[in-house]
A protein has these predicted regions:
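Short, surface-exposed amphipathic charged segments that create phosphate/polyanion-binding patches used
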Residues: 137-148
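Short, flexible loop segments at the rims of nucleotide/cofactor-binding pockets, characterized by
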Residues: 78-82, 146-152
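Alpha-helical substrate-recognition element adjacent to the catalytic core
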Residues: 2-132, 136
Length: 152
């Protein structure tokens, strides 16, 4: 008998990498200061994960450095779709059959998590993650601070 819910993280669990680090690689790969910026993003990721700074502070600082838009998110979705953990690929049918029980909880963002987990039958309402705030041009101007996932 299965439990009522199966809780799964996204970064380094559902996918093999950290999504914001991958976003930074996409964004800064050809930038003149790319290596330095990537290193700073990865340091902030690690500092937040290790508790050296709050998750909220880590997230805010990374977002300020990234300066991303909707196009960057679309490119990230394509890249992350190729980074699904082998065990998740192998058990895709299980996820599709048990979609109501599967909860994805992440410090990442719904905008790139939902399109990926949707391919496994996991429903949007079962994804608990941060959400971006956009301006009228489609540029990401921040994160929804009312979302509980943006906190520690």
């Amino acid at each position: 008998m299965l439990p009522d819910h199966i809780i799964v993280d996204f970064d380094s669990t559902f996918i093999t990498s950290e999504s914001l680090d991958e976003l930074a690689i996409n964004k800064f790969g050809n930038h003149p200061n790319g290596k330095k910026l990537l290193s700073k993003i990865q340091s902030l990721t690690n500092a937040g994960m290790n508790g050296d700074i709050s998750f909220e502070e880590s997230l805010e600082k990374r977002m300020r450095l990234l300066k991303i838009n909707q196009n960057d998110i679309e490119l990230l979705i394509k890249k992350l779709s190729q980074s699904i953990t082998p065990s998740f690929k192998k058990n895709k049918l299980f996820f599709a059959e048990n979609y109501e029980r599967i909860l994805v909880i992440s410090g990442g963002f719904k905008e790139f998590i939902v399109p990926i987990v949707d391919k496994f039958g996991i429903i949007k309402s079962n994804v608990f993650a941060n959400e971006f705030l956009y301006n009228l041009s489609g540029d990401i101007i921040g994160i929804d601070q009312k979302n509980v996932m943006s906190k520690n």
